[in-house]
Amino acid sequence: MLIAKAVAVTLLAGSFGGLTASPSGDAAAYEKQTQLEAKRVACMTERGLDYLASPEPRYTWQPGEQERLAGDLEALRAYRAKYGFGVWSANVYPKDEVVNPVQHENPNNKMLMSLSAGELKKWRAADDSCFSQAVKEVLGKTVTSQEDYHNQLEAAVRKSLSVLDQDKRLVQLGGRFAACLGVSPAEPTALDGLSHTKIVRQASDVAKKAWKGEPPKAPKGKTVIFRPNLKPAHARPYLDKEIKAALKDLECGKDFYPAYSPKAMEITSRVYQEFGREGAAQAIPSRIYRTLV
């Protein structure tokens, strides 16, 4: 993650649909992740390179979180009344783990920082090769690198969620949702997260103005999103506007979310589990913020 004095930078992908809740298959998926990490260790050791297993820790749910992701209006309203969509609230409540969860630190970071540029390049090439081999052995999937793995995962999610755009009831509810928001008619998967995305982009515009020097260029097909690093008092007015937008979005989507979210939840979780990841724990951050630079 690239942290500047003003902002942190994030890549934004095109899909913003389908947040997930914790399904029974998560335990099996987590076991696959553990197996995959063990094989990476063995492969790197065979090549004479260091690697410490680094599975993501099991996800800890916040009170009301699963209900929100399943489209529960009361839980959504309680969250949005304080945090909005969770964008500016991260600045206003810097010590609140609801919007600033503790980040998993990769145990390999210290070792990687000690490598020269040439050694790091060699290590990353070997790691991608070992990762791809482990994915094939554990998941039966063919990938060429970790980036390719994540790209395939996101593509699989988008493809699987597209069935919801053919759901006549969701299309009808989505039409009313869009009309209430004052936006052009859109597919259900495009409506889920639409208002949230607007706030993310607005925050990015504010943060970009504070960027020192030449801003980073986005890889092809992605957009660079700047994350603000404002003090709570400076971020508060932005959060107030975000809360207003989030509550309006919920009022407009009061029929849409309870119908759409449970289906999107099940689909997204299933795909993530197929890729050896806890459905909810891994899918939640990926919907809006795709890959940290």
Across the structure, where does each feature detected by a protein language model lie?
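Secretory targeting and sorting signals
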Residues: 1-21
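Cell-envelope/extracellular polymer assembly enzymes that use nucleotide-activated donors
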Residues: 17-293
